[in-house]
Amino acid sequence: MKALTARQQQVYDLIRDHIEQTGMPPTRAEIAQRLGFRSPNAAEEHLKALQRKGVIEIVSGASRGIRLLMEDETGLPLVGQVAAGEPLLAQQHIEGFYQIDPSLFKPGADFLLRVNGMSMRDIGILDGDLLAVHKTQDVRNGQVVVARIEDEVTVKRLKKQGNMVQLLPENCDFQPIVVDLREQSFTIEGLAVGVIRNGDWI
C-alpha cells in the first residue's frame, strides 16, 4: 500500500473526523471548503488518489459516498521534529501513519523518521527522506543508527571504543560527532533499516 502525501493525509483526516462528529462522510464541496480547494473537483481528485492507494472506497452515485478502508493509527508512525528532552515516539512528534508493511524491512521497522540535512548523502539518505528504523539498542560498530546526544537526535554511522563514541557522517562536508560517555548523555534510539525517498513509497 502506498504512503499518503501530506495533503492526502489531511483529506483522509478530515473525512475520518467528519464521520466521527456527524456520523456521515463530508461532501466534495465540504472538503473543498474546509481545506481551501478551488472547487469540489479538486477534492474529487484527492479522493480518487486515496482510493488508488487503498485507504478509501468511493461509492458512485452518492454525494457522501465515501467509505474508509483503513483503521486509524495503523501502519508505521512518522516522527517529525523532536522536542528537546521528550521521547522520540511521544504523541506530539508523530505526524501521521504510513500504510507500509514493517516486514518489508529486515529487521522489521518500528517507525519512520523524517531526515533533516545532507550529512548521510553519500549512502543515499537525503534531506526530506523517510528513514525506516528498527527500535533497538543492540547495535554494532559500522551500522547506521538513530542516536540521541543530550537533546539532539541524529542519524550517523556508529563507531564506539571504550567510553568514546564517534558518529560518522557520509558526506565530506560534515565532521564526525564525538561523544564522551563519561560526560554526555547518549542513547541509541534505533537501527536504520531502509529509506523511502522524499515520502514516496514505491
From Swiss-Prot:
It comes from Edwardsiella ictaluri (strain 93-146). PANTHER family: LEXA REPRESSOR, LEXA REPRESSOR-RELATED. Represses a number of genes involved in the response to DNA damage (SOS response), including recA and lexA. Binds to the 16 bp palindromic sequence 5'-CTGTATATATATACAG-3'. In the presence of single-stranded DNA, RecA interacts with LexA causing an autocatalytic cleavage which disrupts the DNA-binding part of LexA, leading to derepression of the SOS regulon and eventually DNA repair. CDD domains: S24_LexA-like. It catalyses: Hydrolysis of Ala-|-Gly bond in repressor LexA. SUPFAM superfamilies: LexA/Signal peptidase, Winged helix' DNA-binding domain. The record marks A84, G85 as: Cleavage. Transmembrane segments: none annotated. The lineage of its organism: Bacteria, Pseudomonadati, Pseudomonadota, Gammaproteobacteria, Enterobacterales. The active site is at S119, K156. Belongs to the peptidase S24 family. Homodimer. GO terms for molecular function: DNA binding; serine-type endopeptidase activity. Keywords: Autocatalytic cleavage, DNA damage, DNA repair, DNA replication, DNA-binding, Hydrolase, Repressor, SOS response, Transcription, Transcription regulation. It comes from the Bacteria. Disulfide bonds: none annotated. This is LexA repressor. Residues 28-48 bind DNA. InterPro entries: LexA, LexA-like, LexA/Signal_pep-like_sf, LexA_DNA-bd_dom, LexA_repressor, Peptidase_S24_LexA, Peptidase_S24_S26A/B/C, WH-like_DNA-bd_sf. GO terms for biological process: DNA repair; DNA replication; negative regulation of DNA-templated transcription; proteolysis; SOS response. Pfam families: LexA_DNA_bind, Peptidase_S24. Its EC number is 3.4.21.88.
